[in-house]
Amino acid sequence: MPNQEQIKRMNDINDLIKLIASIDHRTFYRKSKDRIAYFRFKKKLFFVDDYTGDDVYPYEMGYGSPNGFSHGGNMWQLVNSFRKFIITGKCGELRDYKEIWAYSYEGCMKIRQKAKEIGFIETVDYPYSFDEWMNTN
């Protein structure tokens, strides 16, 4: 069973997902289903996919697509980073570069601010572009 801190972090991540689903490209929102993805605890932590509505077990389990997950590999990494944060409290990474998410600078900054506010990331001050990031590392 989850403890109170894990439940709080899950609720915080669900709020972050709602924000992500409301901006620009609206990742994690499925208009045809009018549904936003979210995390929930059953006996274990699950990610409920916005398109399929399936409970997806959010753990890296080798090769192939996870059953019921309708997004690509970068979003799968993000979901796993969210899961790790919910369970352990350790900071994650958004990987919200413009080339990957196709979000505006303003949209990314809103998401980063919320992610920092809940403790998911430590800083909002990192490059907006993956190319910029590559040139700084």
Swiss-Prot record:
Q: Write down what this protein is called.
A: SPbeta prophage-derived uncharacterized protein YoqU
Organism taxonomic ancestry:
Bacteria, Bacillati, Bacillota, Bacilli, Bacillales
